[in-house]
Amino acid sequence: MGVKNIERLIEERQKIEPINPAELTLEEKVVEIRRTTRVVEGGRRFSFSTLAVVGDRNGHVGFGHGKANEVPPSIAKAIADAKKHLIRVPLIEGTIPHDVIGKYESAVVLLKPARKGTGVVAGGPVRPVLELLGVTDILTKIIGRTTNPNNTVRAVFDALLQIRSPEQVAAIRGVDEEKIRKNYRIYASAPIVK
């Protein structure tokens, strides 16, 4: 089995559910800037690759990658690419509806819904993705053996693409939507027990 192509999965989702970035008020965050050096006859040539995330803090988020000989053009390319790879994720009261595990190469990311007041318990490249998505309460864990932000962000998007809304789950199972919705609220509105 080959490596998942997250960009292709996002493009397939956009065919079903198109998102126009011009209609959204998007915020941008740069996750990583890498400098690579190529040695040529006259010395060294530098190029920069940037990983950026965009989101509207209301259920829409995207990531992109850009390369250029200078930092500002690589950031601009990454942001433009991120706007092409936007997805919509169903949120319930500031958290995700259910547990999900995303995988990409050696990166494995676990996302779990959390009660109100927990905050975004995430580190590294996972935090900007979830903050720009609009998640206010979530528990995360990077399980895989990787420190590569590119793979980690793609693993987060693999997890986000697996999230289903209560309506979608009810339609798949052929059950009453209210029954599903009641189970989804276990995490979101349960009182904190001391």
From Swiss-Prot:
InterPro entries: Ribosomal_Su5_D2-typ_SF, Ribosomal_uS5, Ribosomal_uS5_bac-type, Ribosomal_uS5_C, Ribosomal_uS5_N, Ribosomal_uS5_N_CS, Ribsml_uS5_D2-typ_fold_subgr. GO terms for cellular component: small ribosomal subunit. GO terms for molecular function: rRNA binding; structural constituent of ribosome. Gene3D superfamilies: 3.30.160.20, 3.30.230.10. The keyword DNA-binding does not apply. Residues 26-89 form the S5 DRBM domain. Keywords: Ribonucleoprotein, Ribosomal protein, RNA-binding, rRNA-binding. It comes from the Bacteria. GO terms for biological process: translation. Part of the 30S ribosomal subunit. Contacts proteins S4 and S8. The N-terminal domain interacts with the head of the 30S subunit; the C-terminal domain interacts with the body and contacts protein S4. The interaction surface between S4 and S5 is involved in control of translational fidelity. With S4 and S12 plays an important role in translational accuracy. Located at the back of the 30S subunit body where it stabilizes the conformation of the head with respect to the body. HAMAP family: Ribosomal_uS5_B (MF_01307_B). Belongs to the universal ribosomal protein uS5 family. NCBIfam families: rpsE_bact (TIGR01021). This is Small ribosomal subunit protein uS5. It comes from Persephonella marina (strain DSM 14350 / EX-H1). The gene is rpsE.
